[in-house]
């Protein structure tokens, strides 16, 4: 990831220069199911992978466009977290399901603008996240 030249640069890259984030189109159809219902279905997911000094530090996370998520199945919560590379995350619970199962970087740092208007799901809080 190259340093930002915009107005909202990620501070994490200065503090942790060995950390990298790669994003690319998933290239496959992604579906998320919960209680047997498809709650997200897209051919436009972004795969995000984080590494530190060349070693992967977390599983790939798929960010799905909001337009491809059944937003009426989600309830926004007050939970927030901060990532020095991506920005502030907002969370959603699944209706009649686990709390804070979904997150979104609604105003991500410049370097992560590709995940704006997208949602990610915790795999252990849904039935499946599958690629077809």
Residue ranges, per PLM feature:
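Terminal leader/tail segments of proteins
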Residues: 1-132
């Amino acid at each position: 990831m190259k340093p930002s030249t915009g107005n909202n640069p990620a501070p994490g890259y200065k503090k942790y220069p060995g950390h990298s984030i790669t994003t690319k189109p998933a290239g496959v159809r992604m579906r998320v199911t919960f209680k047997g219902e498809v709650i997200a279905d897209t051919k436009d997911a972004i795969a995000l992978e984080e590494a530190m000094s060349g070693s992967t530090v977390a599983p790939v996370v798929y960010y799905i466009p909001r337009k491809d998520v059944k937003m009426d199945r989600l309830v926004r919560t007050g939970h927030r977290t901060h990532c020095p590379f991506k920005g502030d995350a907002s969370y959603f619970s699944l209706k009649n399901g686990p709390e804070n199962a979904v997150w979104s970087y609604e105003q991500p740092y410049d370097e992560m603008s590709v995940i704006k208007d997208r949602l990610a799901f915790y795999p252990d809080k849904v039935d499946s996240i599958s690629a077809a």
